[in-house]
């Protein structure tokens, strides 16, 4: 049985004067733009009680009311894919995602994804938008993700993400030696030419990352990055933008760099590192049902630890 969606929101000043479909996407981000547009056309999403078109301009102060039935995501297969679950109750589950697992079906990845696994593990999650997925990790990024098991939990988690009260802290190994930490406040949007890539662009969405140095090596740095926003590829784009791309990043990696007179093992490991060296290490949020602040930590994966050990050996051999 499908759940009923009942949401209401007032258009804030900063969104006034935009198209209805654009405003709806900002106020109800847990639903896809195409789904929202369909509800607008069907009269399920009204403005001050009136049915408008998606392209109609709406001013600040207007009341948006959404009353619709959440359709089950029956087009996706439930698949028995092993998940490393670090926490689960009737409202949420937290997983430790391995490298290579795509989060959501897309072109080229119609099955074998986290969404397919969730539909098998929690069948009722089919009634939750996007099978409860409220934030994503790239295919080859490892670490912690929270998933909502109910519509109420989904709504509250999305609200926390919008309010930037969910703490997401990552660790990365980057190319280059960073002298000190800092903040990157640079908007992110689609690359002007390579549409599959993201880039720092003036017309992009606000994106803020805070980074600090954990350990320096001869030509690399182990960093910790805290997200204030959660844009697509944010850490990868931001670190590359300031000149410190992630080791192993096939898209934003930039120039390959090897410390002078490095061991063959280190050289080979750096050349063949199979993914971007990025791990979602810490996750902290308010439980959507109890309000209790909860925190989880994921240990660094083996490939990450192996590279760190080789970089330490290289530094010590050089200093010695």
Swiss-Prot record:
GO terms for molecular function: 23S rRNA pseudouridine(1911/1915/1917) synthase activity; pseudouridine synthase activity; RNA binding. InterPro entries: PsdUridine_synth_cat_dom_sf, PsdUridine_synth_RluA-like_CS, PsdUridine_synth_RluC/D, PsdUridine_synth_RsuA/RluA, RluA_PseudoU_synthase, S4_RNA-bd, S4_RNA-bd_sf. Its EC number is 5.4.99.23. The keyword Membrane does not apply. Keywords: Cytoplasm, Isomerase, RNA-binding, rRNA processing. It catalyses: uridine(1911/1915/1917) in 23S rRNA = pseudouridine(1911/1915/1917) in 23S rRNA. CDD domains: PseudoU_synth_RluA_like (cd02869), S4 (cd00165). Residues 18-90 form the S4 RNA-binding domain. It is found in: Cytoplasm. It comes from the Bacteria. It holds the Pfam family S4. The active site is at 138. The keyword Flavoprotein does not apply. One of its GO terms (cellular component) is cytoplasm. One of its GO terms (biological process) is enzyme-directed rRNA pseudouridine synthesis. Responsible for synthesis of pseudouridine from uracil at positions 1911, 1915 and 1917 in 23S ribosomal RNA. Belongs to the pseudouridine synthase RluA family. PANTHER family: MITOCHONDRIAL RNA PSEUDOURIDINE SYNTHASE, RIBOSOMAL LARGE SUBUNIT PSEUDOURIDINE SYNTHASE D. This is Ribosomal large subunit pseudouridine synthase D. It comes from Pseudomonas aeruginosa (strain ATCC 15692 / DSM 22644 / CIP 104116 / JCM 14847 / LMG 12228 / 1C / PRS 101 / PAO1).
């Amino acid at each position: 049985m499908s759940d009923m969606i009942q949401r209401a929101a007032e258009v804030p000043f900063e969104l006034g004067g935009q198209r209805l479909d654009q405003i709806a996407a900002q106020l109800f981000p847990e639903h896809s733009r195409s789904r929202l547009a369909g509800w607008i056309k069907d009269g399920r999403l009204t403005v001050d009680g009136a049915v408008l078109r998606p392209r109609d301009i709406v001013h600040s102060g207007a009341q948006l009311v959404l009353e619709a039935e959440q359709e089950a995501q029956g087009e996706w297969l439930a698949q028995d894919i092993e998940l490393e679950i670090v926490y689960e109750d009737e409202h949420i589950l937290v997983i430790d995602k391995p490298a290579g697992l795509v989060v959501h079906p897309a072109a080229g990845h119609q099955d074998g994804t986290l969404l397919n696994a969730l539909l098998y593990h929690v069948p009722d999650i089919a009634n939750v938008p996007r099978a409860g997925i409220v934030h994503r990790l790239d295919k080859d990024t490892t670490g912690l993700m929270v998933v909502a098991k109910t519509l109420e939990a989904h709504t509250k988690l999305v609200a926390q993400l919008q309010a930037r009260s969910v703490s997401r802290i990552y660790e990365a190994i980057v190319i280059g030696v960073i002298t000190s930490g800092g903040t990157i406040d640079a908007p992110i949007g689609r690359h002007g030419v390579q549409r599959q890539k993201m880039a720092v662009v003036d017309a992009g969405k606000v994106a803020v990352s805070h980074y600090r140095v954990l350990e320096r090596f001869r030509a690399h740095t182990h960093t910790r990055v805290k997200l204030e926003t959660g844009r697509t590829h944010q850490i990868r784009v931001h670190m590359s933008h300031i000149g410190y791309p992630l080791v192993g990043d096939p898209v934003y990696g930039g120039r390959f760099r090897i410390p002078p007179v490095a061991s063959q093992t280190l050289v080979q490991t750096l050349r063949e590192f199979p993914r971007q060296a990025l791990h979602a290490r810490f996750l902290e949020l308010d439980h959507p049902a109890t309000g209790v602040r909860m925190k989880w930590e994921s240990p660094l994966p083996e490939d990450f630890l192996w590279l760190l050990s080789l970089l330490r050996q290289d530094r010590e051999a050089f200093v010695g």
